[in-house]
Amino acid sequence: MATERHYSPLDRLLLQADSAMRTLLPLSAHPQRPSPAVVQPDHKMSDVDTRHVAGLMRINHTGEVCAQALYQGQALTAKLPKVRKAMEHAAEEEIDHLVWCEQRIHQLGSHTSVLNPLFYGLSFGIGAVAGVISDRVSLGFVAATEDQVCKHLSEHLEQLPSEDGKSRAILEQMLNDEEHHAESALEAGGFRFPAPVKFGMSILAKVMTKSTYRI
């Protein structure tokens, strides 16, 4: 029977540093699943639509950077091993989204946000603090965050040009995955955040979306 490996605090810090580099350095992360966009035809879009879609995908990419940092921060401070493993597994799934968005951004001739390191650091800190408070709060924060992500994805799907099947396929799969993450976090005992807290989170999310649309 295989035994579970136990990491020292130093081991975990080194793993966090490795995760941060794979998240922030271009083309350094590798997905477990191929992008849903690969089976979609590549239709020509106007320059205006191309720039708009690139901006939307840049927002989504930064959202995945934040998700990576949030999960890694929570995994570092989670009290129960099963919660830590759940956070680490969720972070692995989010890598797919991260890479899919990055690939699509480059296909559109654009770039990822220069603000990603800042948002990674902020999200990592928030995740670590949530994990210190309690695992229930940590899981609840995941559910509330994923709810915000789902709202953004739904809004972006409505804004996509009809001919952009590639971006649509990516966002639809991301939406499905994020809904599952939110449900799993609550089923695992996550605390349901009250409306005022969710409102505050939505304000922070708007700061991120407004700032990363162009830069």
From Swiss-Prot:
Q: Which cofactor does it need?
A: Fe cation
Quote the Gene3D superfamilies the UniProt record gives: 1.20.1260.10
Q: How does it sit in the membrane?
A: Peripheral membrane protein
Q: Where in the cell is it found?
A: Cell membrane
Answer whether the UniProt record assigns the keyword Oxidoreductase to this protein. Answer: yes
Q: Under which pathway is this protein filed?
A: Cofactor biosynthesis; ubiquinone biosynthesis
What's the main place this protein lives? membrane
**SUPFAM superfamilies registered for this protein in UniProt:** Ferritin-like
Gene Ontology cellular-component terms listed: plasma membrane
**Gene Ontology BP, a term:** ubiquinone biosynthetic process
The record, for Pfam families, names: COQ7
Is Cell inner membrane included in the keywords of this UniProt record? no
Q: Write down the InterPro entries for this protein, in alphabetical order.
A: COQ7_proteobact, Ferritin-like, Ferritin-like_SF, Ubq_synth_Coq7
Record's cofactor remark: Binds 2 iron ions per subunit.
The terms under GO molecular function for this entry are: 3-demethoxyubiquinol 3-hydroxylase activity; metal ion binding
* Name used for this protein in its record: 3-demethoxyubiquinol 3-hydroxylase
- Organism (species): Pseudomonas savastanoi pv. phaseolicola (strain 1448A / Race 6) (Pseudomonas syringae pv. phaseolicola (strain 1448A / Race 6))
